[in-house]
């Protein structure tokens, strides 16, 4: 089982750790966060406003974080190059601070003894992998990879299925996205993106997202054919993708439902879900899929122009894919 270090114990860092313990697929051996001391880590891991209390034991003991009886080394370094991952036995590092997202910055982890780095965010220059879409293109010469964004992980599996069966000529995506930590609780300053600084709980906020364009990186045939935007809405978690696209081959909406359902039960099982139930966002809280197609919500204008809807837990679904990507990478060592 691959031994993993987590850098940044925020939403994704904590939930990757939860996903690791829930699945038993990877072994968390170290955590680094300069802003959270050990006792605070115990509290933050144990209690979660969105996903509920951790079902297990958490305590601090001899300067280590102990989860379900497993001791985890704790570091509090600001500079990734100074974290002694090697001493803790961490082979892979999940870079989940949201700060060190380039090859150069994330590469600092290799200096401390890590063998590979998985960036839990889109990256300007690191190769991006989406489980179920292009993960098989990974080869073990790559030391630093990106797990793309939660939205790309939702959109790409759906886009792949649709493109493989009917061909996507072009498309626009909108994600109606839950609040994240980059937003403000009340109006505040926000650099160049003025709207992003408006109160998150009070507003529907139009925002930019690179998620749709990033699909072109993981599915090269769709490069230049998709773009999109986001609306940030006042919900704590769970988001939904609306993909409106023109199809090459004529397809009835029932044909689309059929191929997505087949994919969800076959090659994309566990990654792409399918539902015909009358669901709403809360129904996907703590869901582990990257994307769940909502058969009842989509519409077709005609046989070539459709709007497709897919839900995702932008925190927990994504965190589970980070774990899955590491398991896949470890299988190629």
UniProtKB/Swiss-Prot annotation:
One Gene Ontology CC term in the entry: GAIT complex
Alphabetized Gene3D superfamilies for the sequence: Dihydrodipicolinate Reductase, domain 2, NAD(P)-binding Rossmann-like Domain
Stretch list, region Interaction with WARS1: 1-146
One Pfam family this sequence matches: Gp_dh_C
Phosphothreonine: residues bearing it: 151, 175, 180, 182, 209, 227, 235
Cross-link entry Glycyl lysine isopeptide (Lys-Gly) (interchain with G-Cter in SUMO2), positions: 184
The enzyme's E.C. designation: 1.2.1.12, 2.6.99.-
Entry-annotated residues carrying S-nitrosocysteine: 150, 245
Binding positions for NAD(+) per the UniProt entry: 11-12, 33, 78, 120, 314
Residues the record lists as Deamidated asparagine modifications: 7, 62, 68, 147, 153, 223, 314
Catalytic machinery residues: 150
Residues binding D-glyceraldehyde 3-phosphate, per UniProt: 149-151, 180, 209-210, 232
Residues with the N6-malonyllysine modification: 192, 213
SMART domains on file: Gp_dh_N
Residues where N6,N6-dimethyllysine is found: 3, 64, 192, 213, 225, 258, 261, 332
UniProt site positions, description: Activates thiol group during catalysis: 177
Regulation (activators, inhibitors): Glyceraldehyde-3-phosphate dehydrogenase activity is inhibited by fumarate, via the formation of S-(2-succinyl)cysteine residues.
PANTHER family: GLYCERALDEHYDE 3-PHOSPHATE DEHYDROGENASE, GLYCERALDEHYDE-3-PHOSPHATE DEHYDROGENASE
Known function: Has both glyceraldehyde-3-phosphate dehydrogenase and nitrosylase activities, thereby playing a role in glycolysis and nuclear functions, respectively. Glyceraldehyde-3-phosphate dehydrogenase is a key enzyme in glycolysis that catalyzes the first step of the pathway by converting D-glyceraldehyde 3-phosphate (G3P) into 3-phospho-D-glyceroyl phosphate. Modulates the organization and assembly of the cytoskeleton. Facilitates the CHP1-dependent microtubule and membrane associations through its ability to stimulate the binding of CHP1 to microtubules.
Name used for this protein in its record: Glyceraldehyde-3-phosphate dehydrogenase
Species of the source: Canis lupus familiaris (Dog)
Name of the encoding gene: GAPDH
